[in-house]
Amino acid sequence: MSLVPEASTSRAPKYCYFFKTLLVEELELETSYHNLHYGQCALIGRLAFKANQYRLENVRVKCLPKKYSLGEGTVSLLILGLTHDKVVENRVSTGRYCIVRGEVVLHNVQHPKGAKLTAGGVYDKINSLSNDPLAQKQYLSALLATYRPAIDLWYIQVIDRAEDLLTRRLEMRSLIEK
């Protein structure tokens, strides 16, 4: 698979103005950042605190066959903007299942206070380099080396029966996308 999208077939991503239900895996395992979800989303997972950062771990998706489903907690996504004070204020705690709403961003892991990027910004940059496929490839390689998907937190809430809720939301999503 090529890192460089075909300029003639690639379409600009449209910002998602509703909290589309996504899997933690869909964001964390995406390596083509120009294909990353652009905009708002809702994620269901288990809150974890690792390496001095709050993260949302994936939840096993019951409706998928085992060979297509990762075990719970296999991957996790950084939650930007979640502080100890917000954890206390929202009555959430590590190990609990949560729904997180926010915006998908790319976070610079080498310079955490650096600028955040979005799939729209990545697309625009790739398009600006459309006459230079080598520059496109170098740009995307540099992104993969320094940026990781994250969620810029807007809201977090503890939930019960996370697997069931996630399954139902994914079923609804598949009906809407048909």
Swiss-Prot record:
Disulfide bridge partners, by residue number: none
Keywords attached to this Swiss-Prot or TrEMBL record, sorted alphabetically, are:
Chromosome, Nucleus, Telomere
The residue stretches assigned to a coiled coil in this entry are none
Query: Would you name any one GO CC term?
Result: telomere cap complex
Gene disruption: observed consequences: Lethal between early pupal and early adult stages. Frequent telomeric fusions in larval neruoblasts.
Other notes on this protein?
Multiple telomeric fusions result in multicentric linear chromosomes that resemble little trains of chromosomes, hence the name 'modigliani', the name of an Italian train named after the artist.
Self-association and partners = Probably homodimerizes. Component of the MTV complex, composed of moi/modigliani, tea and ver/verrocchio. Interacts with ver/verrochio and tea (via C-terminus); the interactions are direct and require fully intact moi/modigliani and ver/verrocchio. The MTV complex is recruited to telomeres by the HipHop-HOAP complex, consisting of HipHop, cav/HOAP and Su(var)205/HP1 to form the terminin telomere-capping complex. Interacts with cav/HOAP and Su(var)205/HP1; the interactions are direct. Probably interacts with peo (via N-terminus and UBC domain).
Q: What does this protein do?
A: Part of the MTV complex that associates with the HipHop-HOAP complex to form the terminin telomere-capping complex involved in telomere maintenance and prevention of telomere fusion. Potentially functions downstream of mei-41/ATR. As part of the MTV complex binds single stranded DNA in a sequence-independent manner, protecting it from degradation.
The name this protein carries in UniProt is: Protein modigliani
Q: Which gene name belongs to this protein?
A: moi
